[in-house]
């Protein structure tokens, strides 16, 4: 089954009897777990009717108060009162190209607040997938997949002119773009489309880049949305299948040095929803002190990695910022091993001026 066929199948599953209630309960558990890790927001690029779905989720009523005996409390209402709808995360709900026309007709555009969300939910970017992935050998590359697949370069999900057409439609109707591009050839085609259409937004993953394309990201104002934990998961596969790459894999520091805005995430559920795993991978280039770093020349310093993990692109709040705060029990700039960074203890998390997690009772 291809991705577009899965899109329609997933939407039908999402609307099956009882699915919405069960999913909402799972989301409440997930947002509590996210708060324990210091997460205050997500971008939902699931192949689904995300705008309508999240509008319903923000308006749904919760059947349970928080557990007053929970020593490490998670929830929105500190007094234990009932919470209505999802209130533990900011959400940007992405729109796929196949649903873009419907979203435009409904009056949506990137940045519009979702009804009933109290400012926590907004319409996100138009999400588009230009190529495949490394592990499936379907990321579209300028060089073949080594001697194992000597005549195979990966695949494109859309022809370049189709990508350009979707970018044009999104841009004309005030949608940002968020385009998945992993192979180095895909990461040439996507900036080409952004150049001709004046599209703005992000390139998702940007895992393999030709050196000449890196400064283009900065020139075009495109954000590189990266998931450093993928480098840890893929390092052995990269060595096997991208032994003679046409570009630089996981070029974090090269992008930063070129002035490209970095935005770090997890790509959950592909990797766990845990920012400290991503930060650790970006800073140390390895999951274990017992293994040498992967591409140490592309590692980031801790301050840059932490800033890239925030919505505002800074590691410290400033007057006028939303009151989304994370209190830590350890100085992240004094950490010396990947194990310590991955185990970063979060003491409390605040979202929009309200605590969503705290282990500081009585202190």
Language model feature labels by segment:
Residues 1-87, 93-108, 128, 135-186, ...:
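Divalent metal-binding segments
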Residues 12-15, 25, 167-178, 185-201, ...:
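His/Asp/Glu-enriched, well-ordered alpha-helical/loop segment
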Residues 60-67, 82-89, 112-119, 172-173, ...:
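Secondary-structure transition/capping motifs at alpha-helix termini
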Residues 73, 82-127, 201-207, 211, ...:
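Phosphate/diphosphate-binding loops
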Residues 120-138, 222-231:
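Non-cysteine beta-strand/loop elements that form the S-adenosyl-L-methionine
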Residues 121-122, 342-344:
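Short, small/polar residue-rich loop motifs at catalytic or cofactor-binding pockets
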Residues 135, 356-357:
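Short, isolated positions in well-ordered beta-strands
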């Amino acid at each position: 089954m291809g991705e577009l066929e899965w899109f329609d199948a997933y939407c039908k599953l999402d609307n099956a009897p009882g699915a919405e209630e069960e999913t909402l309960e799972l989301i409440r558990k997930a947002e509590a777990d996210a708060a324990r890790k210091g997460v205050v927001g997500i971008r939902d690029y699931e192949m689904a009717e995300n705008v309508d779905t999240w509008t319903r989720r923000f308006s749904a009523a919760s059947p349970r108060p928080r557990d007053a005996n929970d020593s490490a409390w998670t929830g929105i209402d500190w007094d234990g009162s009932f919470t209505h709808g999802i209130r533990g995360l900011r959400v940007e709900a992405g729109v796929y190209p196949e649903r873009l026309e419907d979203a435009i007709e409904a009056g949506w555009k990137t940045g519009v607040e979702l009804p009933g969300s109290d400012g926590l939910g907004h319409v996100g970017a138009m999400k588009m997938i230009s190529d495949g992935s490394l592990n499936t050998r379907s990321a579209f590359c300028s060089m073949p997949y080594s001697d194992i697949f000597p005549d195979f370069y990966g695949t494109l999900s859309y022809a370049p002119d189709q990508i350009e057409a979707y970018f044009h439609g999104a841009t004309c109707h005030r949608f940002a773009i968020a385009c998945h591009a992993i192979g180095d050839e895909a990461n040439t085609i996507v900036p080409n489309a952004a150049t001709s259409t004046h599209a703005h937004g992000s390139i998702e993953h940007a895992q393999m880049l030709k050196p000449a394309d890196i400064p283009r990201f900065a020139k075009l104002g495109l954000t590189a949305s990266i998931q450093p934990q993928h480098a840890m998961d893929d390092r052995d596969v990269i060595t096997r299948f991208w032994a003679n790459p046409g570009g630089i894999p996981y070029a974090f520091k090269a992008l930063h040095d070129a002035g490209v805005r970095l935005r770090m995430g997890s790509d959950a559920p592909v990797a766990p929803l845990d920012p400290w795993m991503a930060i650790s991978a970006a800073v140390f280039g390895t999951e274990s002190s017992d293994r040498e770093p992967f591409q140490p020349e592309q590692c980031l310093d801790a301050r840059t990695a932490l800033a890239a993990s925030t919505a505002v692109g800074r590691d410290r709040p400033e007057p006028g910022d939303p009151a989304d705060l994370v209190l830590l029990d350890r100085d992240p700039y004094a950490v010396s091993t990947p194990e310590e960074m991955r185990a970063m203890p979060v003491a409390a998390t605040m979202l929009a001026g309200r605590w969503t997690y705290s282990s500081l009772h009585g202190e």
